[in-house]
Amino acid sequence: MTGEQTFLGLSNNALFRIDPRLSGNKLVESQLKQYVSKNDFSAAATTEKGYIAVASNKGDIRLFDRLGINAKTHIPALGEAIMGLDVSADGKWILGTCKTYLLLIDAEQKEGKNVGKLGFEKSFGKDSKPRPRRLGLNPSHVAQMQVEAKSPLSFTPAKFNTGLDAQETSIITSTGPFMITWNLKKILRGIQNPYTIKRYNEEVKADNFRFGSDKSVIVALPNEVNMVAKQTFKKPTRESISTPMRNLKSRSSIVDSRY
């Protein structure tokens, strides 16, 4: 979506930038950060300004303002392995995906000499590192979903809605035949069960919001890709969890889009 010609790469213990326009191995030597120890990096994401968040299978997260230097902030292991990572365009919010829950982290500093700065720009104080919000499903919903899907909970990498000058308002992920969206405002207000679901007959392979909107969701199933309106997601109840969406092509559920 931008004119950027390079992309970020990572291995178990290194972060680097690849520029396809270069000759040879395409590696930008000045933007290589290699660690002696095996950090087991697993996912990365960038902000609009190019700040970089990197997560690992150990569960920790590093925040950089650019490649080739030490991280500005290191957030210690938060639990399970982090399999997916996303950041808001302005860098305020970091979203990590673990197998059975999500982690939402506020990267803006609230106290000390660097108040108002992001953890990408300045290090957090020793005793003021951000505390992540753990986003999980209600245990009763999980129990029924696992029975219906005949498989344990396993989230796909969660994403914010994105767009040019768009404000992040929603989060989407999936597990088995279920898509789940979280409402960011409801999360921050502490509302119980701030998510809605959509059930399919088949496993959801991938999902994301349509670019520039949080009202439409693109869903990839084993044999087709469709776009559905977010308004068709339902509050999690015994009925909405047990009843799959039967016809993807009904006019009530498909967004009329010329693209």
Give the positions of each predicted feature.
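Loop/turn-rich, solvent-exposed surfaces of beta-rich toroidal or solenoidal domains
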Residues: 97-99, 142-186
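Non-catalytic interaction/regulatory modules that flank or connect domains
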Residues: 166-205, 212-221
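Canonical WD40 repeat/beta-propeller blade segments in eukaryotic WD-repeat proteins
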Residues: 1, 31-45, 79-87, 141-164, ...
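Loop/turn residues immediately N-terminal
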Residues: 13-16, 50, 58-62, 92, ...
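Conserved beta-strand element within WD40/beta-propeller blades
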Residues: 6-11, 45, 52-56, 94-98, ...
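Surface-exposed loop and turn segments in beta-propeller and other repeat-based domains
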Residues: 12, 20-24, 30-37, 57, ...
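Per-blade loop-tip surfaces of WD-repeat and WD-like beta-propellers in eukaryotic adaptors/scaffolds
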Residues: 11-32, 57-73, 104-119, 182-192, ...
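Blade-level signature of beta-propeller repeat domains, shared across WD40, Kelch, NHL, RCC1
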Residues: 102-108, 206-259
